[in-house]
C-alpha cells in the first residue's frame, strides 16, 4: 500500500491534512468497520465463539502482516497499546543492574525519558546526549554509548521534526554492544 492509497482510504483526509499521528488520528474506513464488527460480534454472538480465541487469532494475523511488512519473523513483533506502553515494557523487561548505562537524547518525548528516570533511582546511569537546534553530534553520541546497555532515541523528534540517522545510530550502538530502542511512530 502506498501513502496515496492509504490517504484515499481515510475519509477524514479527503478535505484536510492531519499531522498529529504520535498519539492518535483518524482511521481508514476498513479499520472502523472491523472494530464495529468486532464489537457487534462480541455483544451479540459472544456465546457462539470464545472471544479470547477470536482475539488471539486476530493478534496473530496482525503480527504476521506487520512482520511481512517490515521483513521480520512474527515472533519478533510485539503488539502494544502505544509507543509509551512499548517503551515501558522494554524498560521493565531488561534486567538492569546498578551501574548499567542507558543513553537517550535531549529530544525525546516524555515516554522516552520517564522510564529511564525511574531506573536512575535504582542505580542505573542515564546519559543524555545534548543536541544543538535539534541536531545530534555523532561523535558525542558515539562517546556516550561506548559502554551503554541500552540506547533509546526517536527516529523523528517530536519537538523539532528532526529525522535522526537511525541506521547509523543503531550500528554505533551495536558496535558498543548496546540494545537499541527506536521510537519510530
Walk through the language-model features, giving the residues of each.
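Pyridoxal 5′-phosphate
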Residues: 1-185
Amino acid at each position: 500500500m502506498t501513502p496515496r492509497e492509504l490517504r484515499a482510504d481515510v475519509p477524514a483526509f479527503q478535505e484536510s491534512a492531519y499531522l498529529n499521528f504520535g498519539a492518535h488520528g483518524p482511521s481508514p474506513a476498513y479499520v472502523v468497520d472491523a472494530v464495529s464488527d468486532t464489537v457487534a460480534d462480541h455483544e451479540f454472538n459472544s456465546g457462539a465463539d470464545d472471544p479470547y480465541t477470536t482475539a488471539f487469532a486476530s493478534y496473530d494475523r496482525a503480527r504476521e502482516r506487520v512482520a511481512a511488512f517490515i521483513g521480520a519473523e512474527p515472533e519478533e513483533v510485539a503488539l502494544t497499546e502505544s509507543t509509551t506502553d512499548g517503551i515501558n515494557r522494554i524498560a521493565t523487561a531488561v534486567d538492569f543492574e546498578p551501574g548499567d548505562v542507558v543513553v537517550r537524547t535531549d529530544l525525546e518525548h516524555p515516554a522516552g525519558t520517564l522510564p529511564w528516570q525511574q531506573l536512575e533511582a535504582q542505580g542505573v546511569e542515564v546519559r543524555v546526549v545534548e543536541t544543538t537546534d535539534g541536531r545530534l553530534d555523532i561523535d558525542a553520541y558515539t562517546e556516550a554509548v561506548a559502554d551503554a546497555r541500552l540506547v533509546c532515541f526517536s527516529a523523528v523528534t517530536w519537538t523539532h521534526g528532526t529525522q535522526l540517522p537511525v541506521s547509523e545510530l543503531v550500528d554505533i550502538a551495536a558496535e558498543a554492544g548496546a540494545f537499541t530502542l527506536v521510537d519510530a511512530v
